[in-house]
Each structure stands twice: as structure tokens, then as C-alpha cells.
Swiss-Prot record:
UniProt cofactor(s): heme b
Gene3D superfamilies in the record: Cytochrome Bc1 Complex, Chain C
Name the record gives this protein: Cytochrome b
Species of the source: Euryzygomatomys spinosus
Binding site residues for heme b b566: H97, H196
Pfam families, alphabetized: Cytochrom_B_C, Cytochrome_B
Its membrane topology: Multi-pass membrane protein
Biological role stated in the UniProt entry: Component of the ubiquinol-cytochrome c reductase complex (complex III or cytochrome b-c1 complex) that is part of the mitochondrial respiratory chain. The b-c1 complex mediates electron transfer from ubiquinol to cytochrome c. Contributes to the generation of a proton gradient across the mitochondrial membrane that is then used for ATP synthesis.
Length: 379
């Protein structure tokens, strides 16, 4: 008798990816975030699809259509807040997932890591364009400020900005194209996720020890399916608490005011998950310099494999590197806080110091600490 699960052309792929997949026996809860990100992506696509059924991408009716969704559509408020807060959960898990990769040296899987960084850029672009769609004050001014950064590019900058805007300011053309891109990008992200997994399954998962685990593998199902379900339940619980008790906790009150090109909000700032990068952008007085620092603050992730000087892969047995990584985490929290503060003393200075230390820790201190640990271990 043939086993359909193992022989059917389509089911066989699922079987090799989620059922009979050999997984290390010691991977911790930090390895749960990959599956949670997959669930978040599915949730965002489903809620987004239902929102798109009622939303109109037109400057005169966009804000009203979102209000209509919340007031008149059956459970529209739930769909809208699940989508908005689902994005926040997505980024929390993304940052945990990346942090796990840095801590345990998962970046040595070069292809998987680089595709992951590209995925991060794509998710950030999608989230930014999604924030513009409700056409509130922060949507409009956020779009104006961030797209205007491209004008810092020498020679082609101003033309490029007008090309993206589809006119001489952020208007109907901008909103329509942002909606089109916001709709299509998650599907491209889904395809990229499949490539991300394809490369991961070429090498197999890393594990907390950073050692080769070929001699001690267990099947993914039932061990890690049940573990992922536990993570999923905790995620749903957290998300539901956020949606049902304080749906606007992470949002901006300014976005409940319809977009007005004649009235600038006192503090223009992006969603909380971009604040660290926004703080780095603002900490440099020069426009082009700020834009470069902004891009490099994310692009620097691609340098991690090249900056890995340690003889051990994981930080599990490297306390000095661990300490430095947690300092980096604290630094990012400081940057996130600064990004939400007005541009005045002492926040400017704190932001500049935090930005410098962010790049110094990654580019100088971490590789040097790894070399020192090698020396201390006489490796």
C-alpha cells in the first residue's frame, strides 16, 4: 500500500517541511517565532482582504470608508483593529526572530539570513504604505516626510520623489498606488518566505549550542507542532487582549483627524516599530547623511556573517558577547523612546549618542569582543 503523505507530489512537500522534517532535539522557545510570523502573515492577509472589500482608495472617501468599516460593517471594528495590532505583533516577533538569529549565530546560514533581511525591508515597506491608507493626519504627513527623504539622493532625487507621488505633493495618485502596492506586497512576501524556508531546509535548523545536531534529530511532528501551537495560543491571547481592551494603545491619536495638507501636526512620527530607525535618521543634521544612516541601520544586518570573528557559532558560551548584545538591545529601546520625543535638548544629544553606540557596538565592539574571547579560551 502506498503512503499518500510520502508519495503524493504536493502532500510530499508539506510532509518534508512540517511533518517528517528532522529537527534538533534541543531548540528552545526562541525557535517558535518563525511559525508565529507565518501565522501573523496569514492573519494580515485575511484581515487585509476583508478590509479591502470595504475600503476606498480615494482622498475624499478613504477616511470615511475606514470609519464606515468600524461603525457599519459586521465586526468591522474587530477586523480593522486585528489588522492594525496584528502589524505590531508582526514586528515584535520579527525583532525577536532577528535577535535570536544574532544571539545563536544563525546568520552563518548566509542565503537564509540575507533573504530574511530582504523580507524585513519588504515588511517595513508594506507597513509604511499601510499606515498611509486611513488618510488621517499622521498618515498624510508621515507619507510626505518619509517619501521626501528620497529627494536627498543626488541628481535624480527631486524627480524621483515627484514620480513616486504622481504629482507635486502627496495626493490621490499617491494613495491609489500605495493601496495597490500594499495589497500586492504581502503575496510577494509569502513567496519570499517559501524561498527563506527552502534555504533553511537545505542546511537544517541551528540550535542553542551552535553545534552540529545531525546525530540527534527528532521529527518535527508531533514534538514541534504542539510546541508551535502553544506559542500560537499565547500569541492569540495577547493579540485579543490588545484588540479588545486597548486597541489604540500603539496607535497615534492624530490619525483620528482627517488628513489636512494645510495643518502640520506638532510631532510627526511613524508607528512605534520604526521609531529606532527614525531616531537614527533625525540624529544626523545632514539630510543625505540621515537617509544613509537610516538605510544602513537595517542593511548592517547583512554584515553580521562577515563580522563574525568568534571561533564558536553561538553566544551561549560567550558571556562577554552576551553582555554586549543586551547592551545593544537596551540601546535600541533608548532609540525607540527618542524617536517618539520632540526634537529638542536633551533628546537630540541622547539620540546622537545612542545612534553612534548602535553602529559602534555592531561594527567594532562585537567583533573585538569575539576575538578577545577566542584569546581567553586559547582557541
Amino acid at each position: 500500500m502506498t503512503n499518500t503523505r510520502k508519495n503524493h507530489p504536493l502532500i510530499k512537500i508539506i510532509n518534508h517541511s512540517f511533518i517528517d522534517l528532522p529537527a534538533p532535539s534541543n531548540i528552545s522557545a526562541w525557535w517558535n517565532f518563525g511559525s508565529l510570523l507565518g501565522v501573523c502573515l496569514a492573519l494580515q492577509i485575511i484581515t487585509g482582504l476583508f478590509l479591502a472589500m470595504h475600503y476606498t482608495a480615494d482622498t475624499t472617501t478613504a477616511f470615511s470608508s475606514v470609519t464606515h468599516i468600524c461603525r457599519d460593517v459586521n465586526y468591522g471594528w474587530l477586523i480593522r483593529y486585528a489588522h492594525a495590532n496584528g502589524a505590531s505583533m508582526f514586528f515584535i516577533f520579527l525583532y525577536f526572530h532577528i535577535g535570536r538569529g544574532i544571539y545563536y549565530g544563525s546568520y552563518t546560514f548566509m542565503e537564509t539570513w540575507n533573504i530574511g533581511v530582504i523580507l524585513l525591508f519588504m515588511v517595513m515597506a508594506t507597513a509604511f504604505m499601510g499606515y498611509v491608507l486611513p488618510w488621517g493626519q499622521m498618515s498624510f504627513w508621515g507619507a510626505t516626510v518619509i517619501t521626501n527623504l528620497l529627494s536627498a539622493i543626488p541628481y535624480i532625487g527631486p524627480t524621483l520623489v515627484e514620480w513616486i507621488w504622481g504629482g507635486f505633493s502627496v495626493d490621490k495618485a499617491t494613495l491609489t498606488r500605495f493601496f495597490a502596492f500594499h495589497f500586492i506586497l504581502p503575496f510577494i512576501i509569502t513567496a519570499m518566505v517559501m524561498i527563506h524556508l527552502l534555504f533553511l531546509h537545505e542546511s537544517g535548523s541551528n540550535n542553542p549550542s551552535g553545534l552540529n545536531s545531525d546525530s540527534d534529530k527528532i521529527p518535527f511532528h508531533p514534538y514541534y507542532t504542539i510546541k508551535d501551537i502553544l506559542g500560537l495560543l499565547l500569541m492569540i491571547l495577547t493579540l485579543l487582549m490588545l484588540i479588545l481592551f486597548s486597541p489604540d494603545l500603539l496607535g497615534d491619536p492624530d490619525n483620528y483627524t482627517p488628513a489636512n495638507p494645510l495643518n502640520t501636526p506638532p510631532h510627526i512620527k511613524p508607528e512605534w516599530y520604526f521609531l529606532f530607525a527614525y531616531a537614527i535618521l533625525r540624529s544626523i543634521p545632514n539630510k543625505l547623511g540621515g537617509v544613509l544612516a537610516l538605510v544602513l541601520s537595517i542593511l548592517i544586518l547583512m554584515l553580521f556573517p562577515a563580522l563574525h570573528t568568534a571561533k564558536q557559532r553561538s553566544m551561549t558560551f560567550r558571556p562577554m558577547s552576551q553582555c554586549l548584545l543586551w547592551i545593544l538591545v537596551a540601546n535600541l529601546i533608548i532609540l525607540t523612546w527618542i524617536g517618539g520625543q520632540p526634537v529638542e535638548y536633551p533628546f537630540i544629544t541622547i539620540g546622537q549618542l545612542a545612534s553612534i553606540s548602535y553602529f559602534c557596538i555592531i561594527l567594532i565592539l562585537m567583533p573585538m569582543t569575539s576575538l578577545m574571547e577566542n584569546h581567553l579560551l586559547k582557541w
